[in-house]
Amino acid sequence: MPEKLPEIVRNQPEDKPYLVTGRRIYVIGAQDGGFPQRGEHMPHEMWGIWLPPIKLFNGFWLWLEDDWIGKADRFVMEPFGCRFVYERKEIELERFQWAAHTRGAMALELTVRNLTQAPVQKSLALVIESNLMPVWLSERMGRKDGKDSVSCDLEKGLAAWKDQENPWSAVMICDQPLDAFELLEESRTGSGQRPCGSAGKACDRQGYKNENTSCCKVSFSARLAAGESKRFSFFFGGSVCSRQEAGEQAGALMENRQELLEEKRERYLELGGRASLSFAGEPVLEQMYRWNQFINDWIQCEIPGVGEGVVAGYAEFPWWFGNDTNYILPALLMQGEVAICKETLRLLRRASLKVNGNGRVIHEMSNNGVVFYEGMTTETPQFADCVWQIYCFEGDESFLEEMYDFCREGMRWIESVSEEGLPRGYGISEVAGLDCMCCDVAILAVRGYEVMSKMAKALGREADASCFEEKFCATWEIFHREFFIPETGFYGDMVAGREEIIKRAESWKHSLKSFPITPEDEIVGEASCKQDKSPRESKEKERLCRRMENVIRLAKETEPKSRRAYQLFGLGHSTIAVEFGYVTGKQARELLAAQEQWREKECFQIDGIMPLALGRRMQAYGYSREPEKILQVLRQTGEGFGAVMPGATSEIYPDRGCFVQGWNSFATMWPYFSVIFGVRPRAGQKELILQPCICPDMGKISLTGVMIAGRPFSFFLDFEEGRGRIRVEIPSAQWRVNLVWEEEQDGKPELVVEVCDAKA
C-alpha cells in the first residue's frame, strides 16, 4: 500500500472543471473557484452539486469584506477532494471540498490564516444558489421543477431549501453560528446578472435564466490573533424525500467529520495498492494509471430505488450505458471491484427486462431510471461478454448461472434481427443510416456466440455449448466472406444492397447526423444527442463528399439485388476482428497496415480520437505482435493526461467531451495486464494463460496486487541483454501459469513463477 496519496497542483487555475464525488453526491465546478453554468443534455445545468436524480445547488461563492473574493491563486486536486488557495491582504484562505463516501452530503471547509503579527478581523460570506430540479428525462415521469424556498436559523448556523412542488430538499449546517442572512433575489434576477459566475463574477448566461432558483448570502466573521488559523466548516446535505432527511445527512457528516474523512483517505490509499503499476522511465504513464485507479471509484454511483453501478462519465453522462460498461469493467476487475461490476450488470438487466423483455440490452438510462434508447444491436452481445469476463476473474459459477438465461435470450434476439446469420442495426458509431449490416454489429455478434458457448460449457450445458460453438464458427465464416474487401485488404464498414447504400450515401454527402433514437424530440436536451458529426473543416467536408460519390459509383456497378461491403468513413471497426484474436500474427499485421494506409490516403476524421479507440488499437497490436506500437500508443494516450482536469483524460483526445470518462481505463490501465503481460485469467480452473507482447524498449514494468479470485497476483517484466524475463507471483501452488508464444515470434521470454502466500 502506498504511504501517501498523490496530489496535482495548478497555479493560476482556469475555469476548467473539477470533480468531487461520493456514491450519492457529486460536485462539478471550476478550478478557479467558480461555478459556471454549463451543460448539453440539460443546457447550462450539468455542473453544480447533484444528488442524483436531482440537482441541489448551482454552486456557492466566497465573499471577503462585502465583495467577491475572485479567482483562486492555486488549485490542488486530491483523490478524495480538492483545495483552493486564495492569497489576500493579511490573510490566506484555503477552501477544502470533499464528499462523504456513502452519504448524500458534502463538506466545504474554509481555513482562514492570519499572515500578520497583529490581530485581524475579517468579514466573510458565502453566497449560495439552490437549484432543486430533476435530472434529464424526468419529464417522461411527469416530474416538474418548482420554485425553491429558503429559510435560515442564524443561531444554529443552518439554512434549508425546499422545492415548493416536490419534496426535494437541501440543508446547509455551519459548525458555528452565523452573523447574518440575506436573500439576493433582486441582484440575481433584476439586472440579468448574478453574483455567481466563474470565480464569483457576474455571469452572462446568453439569455438563459432559471426562475425557480433561490440565491442567498450567509455571513460570518473571522477574528484571528497574530499567526492564528481558524476553520469554518459547512456541511451540505440533500434528499429527494424530505427536509428532515436532508438535515440528517448534513448533520451526520458534521458529527462524524474526522472519522468519515479518514475513512475516505484510507479507502483511496488501499485502492492505490491494488493492481498498482510501476513503469521505469515513464512517470506520466505511471501517474495516469494511478489516477485512473481513483477514477474507477469516482464513477461508482448508488441511487435508492434505481440501483448502483458504474456510470459513463462527467459532466454529460453521470448515468448508465450498455456499451460503456463493456469497456469499464476490465480495469475494475483488476482492482477486485467484482461486486460493483455485478451490480452494474444487474441494473442493466432489470432495466432491459422492463423496457424490452426479450434479452435486448438497453443503450442509455438516466439516473432516474428512465431509459433513453432501447439498445444498440452491439450492446446485447457485449453484455454477455461482460458476464464472461467476471467469471474469468472470479471463477464463481453462481453469477454465471444467474445471468445465463438472460444472455441466451439476448442472443436469440440477435438472431431475430439477423439476415443470413448476421444482425442488422445500429452500433457504436451512431450515424443516421448506419444500420444495415455493420462491421462492429456483426463481429460483436460473432463474439456473443463465442462467449455463450464458453458459458454453457462452464455450466455443463453441453447441448447449448455445442449449438453456440457451431454458430460462432459459422458466423465468423460469414463475417469474413461478407465484409472482407480484397481491394483494400481489410474489412468494410457496412454490407448493404445497392438501393440501401445509394440513398444513405446521398444523405451522408451533406451531413452525418446522429441517428433519430426516439420520436420524443420535444423533450429538452434530447436534441443535443443528435449532433451532426460531419467534419468541421471545408477540406474535410469535400473529402467526405468525394468518398460518398465513390461509394455511390461502386453501388451503381453492382447488381440491383446483390449486396457488397463498403468502406465508408474509416471507422476502424475492421480492427475488432484482431482485438478478439480472430485474426493474429502476420495476417493481423497486414490487415492493420492496410487499414492505416487507407486512412492516410482516403479517410477523414468524423470525430476526435477517443482514448477508448487507442485502447482498442493496443488490443489489436497485442495480437498482431507489434509491441513497439503498443508503447507508442500508450505514450500518445499520456499526452492527453490532465489536459482538462488534473488526474483525468477526456472522452475525446486531448480535451473534448466528458472531462472524466470511465471507459478510458481501457487505454490507461487494461493494456498492461491484457496486452503487455497478455494475461488471460481462468479463475475457475485456477489457471493463468500468458500471451505477452513485449520489447526491450519497455524496460522494467511491474503490475502488483492484481485481484483474481479474491487473491493478489503480481507480474514483473525486465530485460537482460535484450532477452525478456517475466516473473509471476501467485498466492498458492494450486495455480498454474502457462506461457503461449507463437513459433514465428523471436525472443521468447523466460518465465519464472513464484508462490507468494500474501493475503488479499
Name each model feature, range by range.
Residues 163-169, 175-188, 274, 279-297, ...:
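Active-site acid/base region of carbohydrate-active enzymes
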Residues 118-123, 244, 341-342, 394-404:
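Short secondary-structure capping/junction motifs at helix and strand boundaries
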Residues 318-342, 346-353, 405, 430-432, ...:
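Active-site core of glycosidic bond-cleaving carbohydrate-active enzymes
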Residues 232, 381, 385, 412, ...:
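Generic structural signal for well-ordered, non-membrane alpha-helices
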Residues 350-359, 409-416, 474-478, 597-608, ...:
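Short, mixed-charge aromatic SLiMs
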Residues 207-215, 266-392, 397-400, 427, ...:
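Substrate-binding groove/exosite segments of carbohydrate-active enzymes
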Residues 1-280, 626, 630, 634, ...:
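Terminal accessory carbohydrate-recognition/targeting modules of carbohydrate-active enzymes
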Residues 471, 495-497, 652-654, 687-695:
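A glycine-rich phosphate-binding loop feature that marks nucleotide/adenosyl-phosphate handling sites
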